[in-house]
């Protein structure tokens, strides 16, 4: 996570949001906040590819200067998190960004992604 301009409180909120999303879903989450160069999508793909376990990781890239937001899911993560769910989380984050709440938007978006990817509990009904 790149957060040179973030306060300690903001950094802590984002780290907590990442940990909660991971706890809910069993996936790994990575957040990049900063400059994404000329092509945010290509940058997100490159960053995702450099992660320790890209197959099981969801990368959220946010470049406030370029108004760019990218969500990249690894091959295994994609089994638990659909493109539509990522789009819904992105729309939610963007709504917060427009209202001037970058940290809240990222935190809530990560929570949404973690919730969408939550592993379902299998309930067995005993006939009797």
Label each residue range with its predicted role.
Residues 1-57, 64-128:
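A structural boundary signal for the start of the first folded domain, especially the loop/turn
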